[in-house]
Amino acid sequence: MKRGLLPIALAAALAGGAMGAGRDAVETRICASLEEASRGSPGPVLLVFFSTDCPICYDDLFESRYLVDKGRWPVSVVGVFSGPRDDLKAFLEKYAWTLPVVLDRRKVLFKKYKVDAVPFKALLLGTEAVYRDDPYVGPDGRREELKRCLTQLFYR
């Protein structure tokens, strides 16, 4: 190979690898189970059940991540979605969501944590839910209640 072509070939190979990694990045965020999604995070997990066609769910998902980041609590935020994989993939790409999402097509987590409607949040310590959204309380009240629960959990 000529000297001038070597850097071009190397750049093309690296670009191809980077492009391939970018395509697969969405796939790695879509998990088949809660265990897969929370792997490597020994602390509590905040499950955020959502739908891609629900603007309130979108707000709840991103506000949950913001709340955990702002409070600097060692909590993993994991989305839970039961709709079509293509809808989830498009959502993740459109909004650049980088945290894991469990694709729960059989609604195993929905049933386990008794989720009837979205948006809904549950804070898990191990497998026990120490916080569950109250569907009869508005979004602001639920946010404050979650914040109070996290504060009690970490600042005893």
Predicted feature descriptions by range:
Residues 49-63:
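Conserved redox-active cysteine motifs that mediate thiol-disulfide chemistry
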Residues 7-15:
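Bacterial N-terminal signal peptides
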Residues 75-87, 99-106:
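Thiol-based oxidoreductase modules, predominantly thioredoxin-like and allied folds used
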Residues 25-44:
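A short beta-strand-turn-helix
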